[in-house]
Amino acid sequence: MPRIPVINTSHLDRIDELLVDNTETGEFKLHRSVFTDQALFDLEMKYIFEGNWVYLAHESQIPNNNDYYTTYIGRQPILIARNRNGELNAMINACSHRGAQLCRHKRGNKTTYTCPFHGWTFNNSGKLLKVKDPSDAGYSDCFNQDGSHDLKKVARFESYKGFLFGSLNPDVPSLQEFLGETTKIIDMIVGQSDQGLEVLRGVSTYTYEGNWKLTAENGADGYHVSAVHWNYAATTQHRKEKQAGDTIRAMSAGSWGKHGGGSYGFEHGHMLLWTQWGNPEDRPNFPKAAEYTEKFGAAMSKWMIERSRNLCLYPNVYLMDQFGSQIRVLRPISVNKTEVTIYCIAPVGEAPEARARRIRQYEDFFNASGMATPDDLEEFRACQAGYAGIELEWNDMCRGSKHWIYGPDDAANEIGLKPAISGIKTEDEGLYLAQHQYWLKSMKQAIAAEKEFASRQGENA
């Protein structure tokens, strides 16, 4: 029997036609069915969210021995636990007996987990320690042999500088290979402190009525900022004009993109949007400019302090260092519903004044009650509703195509960054093209795998 039922892909034989990438005619567009088709969503969950690397958590969220943290890989509940020796393990958060979730809170500290359903007990490395009422239970000889009834470990589980990723597919390439050039951007965030990063207390989780790709695109959409977030831009500009009232010292949205910026599309669907700040002196880490220059060089220091960065690690997380510093994690619930969870991040050992400013900037722009997030969610809802208008089939992505650069631009060359495509303006849309090219490649591989699986089933019937 198949581990997961075969997905019917018979209507997807012409999937190549869903993405138009024509450099001769200048047409770059995506068919809107990719946001609404149930079979495509099922393939995405199985092959992108469960069959490739996804972000799980940050090590600072499981800091102590015996701490645990719960999350998801696609549809499957995951438990990350630090055992008594300090080792991290990632396991399916389901009892090996009858499948009940073991850990039912987001986080905690336990040396063992006892299933509330039938009382089986596991240690925090996943080993089955005992079952309830074992005497004269009549278990088969094969019961609990060679770890047969231990918790199921996640097939691949790796960390990059504190960021934890997992995959249910044992054959994925190494995490370092998957992240590729984006590690240089991650290093900019982590390098702000010799002690690394930490996730601060507090979390905001919300859902919106729309496909997951809407937020995957939007976090690197520089074109929407002045339209959707005009109220925030006006508010921060008003504060700047009345300096006495600007206790938050928010980063200037009114000057977004006016001092330079751009975007990059990388292999494996990753993206980066960046801008040159109009007021870098209000960044929490601005006092460390000389230290960064000495440690990393002038070019890297400039990128770390004077430039905002929205980094999408495809498919499910943004690392943002801009109006606030945050980790934004998306989780598809259904083809037209998505959950988003955001955390404020900061360098370990940050000065109290800088930490307070960082938190206030984060609260100002983000959170479900911030001045920006609700605006984005309304546009996601409106887009998903608009996709029902199937007579208008395409999303256009040609903005900036006349000046896209295939490969690195001058700003990327400053730090040896090697993107697949560079947009020289923040409003350019070529980075979406790179992301959707990877999506299409993944979907074609998924369809081929499903057809092969269906064929083998037919032979064995």
Curated annotation (Swiss-Prot):
GO molecular function, one term: 2 iron, 2 sulfur cluster binding
Domain of life assignment: Bacteria
Domain Rieske: 54-151
Cofactor: [2Fe-2S] cluster; Fe cation
Pathway note: Aromatic compound metabolism; benzoate degradation via hydroxylation; catechol from benzoate: step 1/2
Keyword 4Fe-4S: no
UniProt keyword annotation of Metal-binding present: yes
Textual note on the cofactor: Binds 1 [2Fe-2S] cluster. Binds 1 Fe cation.
Keywords: 2Fe-2S, Aromatic hydrocarbons catabolism, Dioxygenase, Iron, Iron-sulfur, Metal-binding, NAD, Oxidoreductase
Functional summary from the UniProt entry: Degradation of benzoate to 2-hydro-1,2-dihydroxybenzoate (DHB).
Protein name, entry field: Benzoate 1,2-dioxygenase subunit alpha
Organism: Acinetobacter baylyi (strain ATCC 33305 / BD413 / ADP1)
Encoding gene, per UniProt annotation: benA
